[in-house]
A protein has these predicted regions:
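Hydrophobic, well-ordered beta-alpha structural blocks that scaffold small-molecule cofactor pockets
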Residues: 1-44, 49
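Residue-level detector of alpha-helix initiation sites
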Residues: 22-23, 82, 128
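Short loop/edge segments at beta-strand edges and connector loops
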Residues: 42, 59-62, 102
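Glycine-rich, highly charged phosphate/nucleotide-binding loops
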Residues: 54-66
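Short basic, glycine-rich beta-strand/loop surfaces that mediate nucleic-acid
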Residues: 72-79, 109-129
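ADP-ribose/adenylate-binding Rossmann-like module
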Residues: 73-77, 85-109
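Conserved small/polar residues in nucleotide/adenosyl-binding loops
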Residues: 134-136
Length: 136
């Protein structure tokens, strides 16, 4: 996927993660570092996510269209390919940026490798190839 490099301000913006496991945890941590208002919806939410988010920002159960519509971006990080695909379709039809952890072809954005030195941030995308280049 050829991606346009862009940095966006997500401070205090609602970012939805659907899924409550280790992959979701990594995305929670990343978004929180940039000041996002992270919400998690999942059938089960790991303890580490529960420690990082107040109860008002996490819910056990199934994601709803309203959850998606109120978000500025969505990450589909469930263990169900079908669920992730359904989330992607809902986001696509509403022009909401979506990252699907198990289907790059359904993503409208990716998480680049990030190098941060003070106020300088560099995002690196290798298109899934030459991952050793990230360590420059």
């Amino acid at each position: 996927m050829a991606c346009f490099p862009i940095f966006i301000d997500i401070k205090q913006k609602k970012c939805l993660i659907v899924g409550g496991g280790k992959v979701a945890l990594r995305k929670v941590e990343t978004l929180l570092r940039y000041g996002a208002c992270v919400h998690v919806v999942a059938e089960q939410i790991c303890e580490d996510i529960c420690k990082q988010l107040p109860s008002a920002q996490r819910r056990t159960g199934h994601v709803t269209e309203t959850d998606i519509e109120k978000s500025v971006l969505v990450i589909a990080a469930t263990s169900s390919r079908e669920t992730n695909h359904r989330i992607a379709e809902l986001c696509h039809s509403r022009n909401i940026p979506v990252n699907v952890i198990d289907a790059p072809e359904e993503c409208t954005f990716i998480f680049p490798a990030v190098v941060q030195k003070g106020d300088v941030s560099i995002g690196i995308n290798t298109g899934g190839k030459s991952l050793s280049l990230i360590h420059i």
